Amino acid sequence: MTDKFQAVVVGGGPGGYVCAIRLAQLGLKTACIESRGSLGGTCLNVGCIPSKSLLNLSEEFYKVQHLSNKGIEVGEVKLNLEKMMKSKDKAVTILTKGVEFLLKKNKVTYYKGIGSFKSQNEI
C-alpha cells in the first residue's frame, strides 16, 4: 500500500479514534488502523457496553417478575438467552458503526489490520 498520511494512529479504541478525529479536524491527512475489525476498543466491543446491556436486560427481567407486588399480574416470565445476546450484539454494532461513521465524517481513513513500523517513515 502506498497511501501517504501526515498522521497514522495505531489503535481504534477510545484514545485512538478520538485522536485520529482531532488530527483530521486540525487539517492533517489521517489514518487509523485497528486490528480488532471494529472500532471502539475493549469497552465498546467486549467490556463495559456489552456487560451493561446484559445487566440492563437482567434488571428488566427482575422487574417483570416482581410486578405483582405492585398489582400487575403477568404470566410466566422466561429468559431467552439467545435473544438477549442478539440484543446485546445489536447495541454493540450500532455503537461501533457510529464510531466508524465519525471517522468517515471527519475524513479519517480506516484500515482493518495490524499496524507496525517498517521504517522511520513507513507503517
Ranges and model annotations:
Residues 1-13:
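Beta1/beta-strand and adjacent pyrophosphate-binding region of the FAD-binding site
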Residues 2-5, 22-28, 34-123:
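Glycine-rich flavin
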Residues 10, 33-34:
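The conserved SAM/SAH-binding core of class I Rossmann-like methyltransferase domains
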Residues 16-17:
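N-terminal Rossmann-fold NAD(P) dinucleotide-binding loop
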